[in-house]
Amino acid sequence: MNNTLERLATLLEERKNADPQHSYVAHLYQAGQDKILKKLGEEAIETILAAKSRESDAIIYETADLWFHSLVMLAESGLRPEQVLSELERRFGLSGLEEKANRG
């Protein structure tokens, strides 16, 4: 797994025990799944708007926010990024149509 993702996943796990007054991530965890999902949705919209602008810096910045909040959602759900990477690896080499057909 990418070292940055691994380090970030470890940090996000540690933040589950942090003081919400001193940690943004701990604050999100304390607020609960609905707050995390709302934030994830906001970041998805901001990423779409950045892509529409075709401004590379904005796209990168907003995608980083989207990925970060996706990792928070995974951690809150008791999942790790390597599980998502394993799923991507499983799909690698499958056509999109074949993968969709495999889902039933």
UniProtKB/Swiss-Prot annotation:
Pathway: Amino-acid biosynthesis; L-histidine biosynthesis; L-histidine from 5-phospho-alpha-D-ribose 1-diphosphate: step 2/9
UniProt cross-references to InterPro entries, sorted A to Z: HisE, PRib-ATP_PPHydrolase-like
Enzyme Commission number: 3.6.1.31
BP-aspect Gene Ontology terms: L-histidine biosynthetic process
GO molecular function ontology, one term from the record: ATP binding
Pfam families (UniProt xref): PRA-PH (PF01503)
UniProt-annotated location(s): Cytoplasm
GO CC annotation: cytoplasm
EC class of the enzyme, as a word: hydrolase
Keyword Amino-acid biosynthesis: yes
Keywords from the UniProt entry: Amino-acid biosynthesis, ATP-binding, Cytoplasm, Histidine biosynthesis, Hydrolase, Nucleotide-binding
UniProt catalytic activity: 1-(5-phospho-beta-D-ribosyl)-ATP + H2O = 1-(5-phospho-beta-D-ribosyl)-5'-AMP + diphosphate + H(+)
Keyword Cell inner membrane: no
Similarity remark: Belongs to the PRA-PH family.
UniProt-recorded name of the protein: Phosphoribosyl-ATP pyrophosphatase
Annotated organism of origin: Nitrosococcus oceani (strain ATCC 19707 / BCRC 17464 / JCM 30415 / NCIMB 11848 / C-107)
